[in-house]
């Protein structure tokens, strides 16, 4: 895969909602100059699945998130929140 991992390292995005995670994945995909279809092929998924993930729609299996991240050269990192302030809009949840 032609992902430039060094270029990807300078972009760290913290997410707290499905919509934010989808937007982050879309941003990484765009930086890697990949289409949804090419990312789907690399991840062993359908293009429609990538679209749903990027839109934060429905429920997504954790294995799907890991497959997408692996195809983009990303890893999932858990850490304590930086603040207790909720930093998203209600429409990000519903």
Can you name each region flagged by the protein language model?
Residues 43, 82-83:
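Conserved beta-strand edge residues that scaffold enzyme active sites
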Residues 63-79:
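DNA major-groove recognition helix of helix-turn-helix/homeodomain DNA-binding modules
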Residues 44-58:
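Recognition helix of helix-turn-helix/homeodomain-like DNA-binding domains
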Residues 21, 44-46, 71:
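Short N-terminal alpha-helical targeting/association segments
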Residues 1-20, 83-94:
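N-terminal flexible/basic segments that precede or flank functional cores
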């Amino acid at each position: 895969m032609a992902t430039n991992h060094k270029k990807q390292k300078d972009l760290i995005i913290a997410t707290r909602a499905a919509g934010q995670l989808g937007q982050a994945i879309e941003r990484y995909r765009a930086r890697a100059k990949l289409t949804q279809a090419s990312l789907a092929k690399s991840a062993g998924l359908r293009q429609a699945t990538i679209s749903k993930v990027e839109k934060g729609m429905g429920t997504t299996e954790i294995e799907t998130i890991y497959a997408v991240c692996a195809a983009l050269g990303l890893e999932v990192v858990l850490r304590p929140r930086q603040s207790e302030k909720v930093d998203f809009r209600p429409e990000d949840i519903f």
